[in-house]
Amino acid sequence: MRLLERLWGKKPSRKSDKKKKGTSNYAYAVTRVRAMKSKLLPKETYPRLLNMGIDEITRFIQESEYKNDVDELAMKYSGGDLAEHALNRNLALTYDKLLRITSGELNYLIAAYLLRYDIWNVKTLLRGKLYNASVEDILESLISAGEFTYTFLSELAAKATYQEIIDALKETDYYPLLQEFDGNNLAYIENELDKMYYSSLFAAIGKPRSKDRKLFARFIKLEVDVKNLGTLFRLKKAGVEKSDEIMPLMIEGGLELKPEKLATLPYEQFIDELRKTQYWDAIATVTGLETASLTIVESRLIRYYLESATTYSHVSPISIVPIMEYIIHKNNEVNNLRIIFRGKEADLSDTLIKDQLVVI
């Protein structure tokens, strides 16, 4: 554990950062974030990466913003494992930096948003133990960008059973729900954790009165719509049309979609209803939408979300939105790199890998 803590560095407490009061330092924070955004990989990078092997890609990112992460972890990991850990470490440290350079309401909202990584980690830990994954495989997927430190997550990953993990989370807000986990209802628990996260996030936002909270709320509502739409596509393609099977999987608080209206529609009518929404432009150009792969559809929806964030950022340049734009674009970059590494390790074709990438 000492080695891991040394590699990752000591993590600042998130609890002390969550202050609603105080002055938000928008101008300073946005200026810093613009500099950070300029270091994101340009879209021209991805075709080049697809033509490289794993070792070449690792060397490439070692010469980029991920250099320190690769260098720090190179003594412990190699190949794809090194890349996974370096990407996750970089993402966590990047988000920690955002919390250090923000204050007041701005800091409070960002911290609330980043709690999604605690949800991600809890789901990863449960899934890993349920399917007997090795401790190393579990660690490879953990991202300490929420309140849980990497040291704490490492201790959880080393537990022998999922029940021991749940017991170790007794003091968290997730514990009452996790007590319902019986080893056979993972999908239910994961969905409820997601719903719990968004419910808590909307509670943190409260009734948005300030311009920043209104922008932030709209941003999250758009994200909820995109997530619900992805779920609806999966269910509709599977032939699920019963409201009592679909509605429990929907997240409340979306911007435009009416899941209760879409739930019972057959696939063709579902598509017709989508033509009336802002999301149609995102998927209208998908060839053979009725038979297109879910991967392509979901990639288009994520792309729309990213592009919308950029549009919001241009409309409100000195606000929380440019920072949120950077957060999701940074996450997307890490996801893209992870997809390429995993695809290369699995010997997937460049076409299959490319279909999963979201490149802006």
UniProtKB/Swiss-Prot annotation:
It is found in: Cell membrane. GO terms for molecular function: ATP binding; proton-transporting ATP synthase activity, rotational mechanism; proton-transporting ATPase activity, rotational mechanism. It is a peripheral membrane protein. SUPFAM superfamilies: V-type ATP synthase subunit C. Residues 1-23 are annotated as: Disordered. The keyword Cell membrane applies. Residues 9-22 have a biased composition (Basic residues). Coiled coil: none annotated. It holds the Pfam family vATP-synt_AC39. GO terms for biological process: proton motive force-driven plasma membrane ATP synthesis. Keywords: ATP synthesis, Cell membrane, Hydrogen ion transport, Ion transport, Membrane, Transport. Its main location: membrane. The keyword DNA repair does not apply. GO terms for cellular component: plasma membrane; proton-transporting V-type ATPase, V0 domain. InterPro entries: ATPase_csu/dsu_sf, ATPase_V0-cplx_csu, ATPase_V0-cplx_csu/dsu, V-ATPase_V0D/AC39_subunit, V-type_ATPase_csu/dsu, V-type_ATPase_csu/dsu_dom_3. Has multiple subunits with at least A(3), B(3), C, D, E, F, H, I and proteolipid K(x). Component of the A-type ATP synthase that produces ATP from ADP in the presence of a proton gradient across the membrane. Belongs to the V-ATPase V0D/AC39 subunit family. This is A-type ATP synthase subunit C. It comes from Methanosarcina acetivorans (strain ATCC 35395 / DSM 2834 / JCM 12185 / C2A).
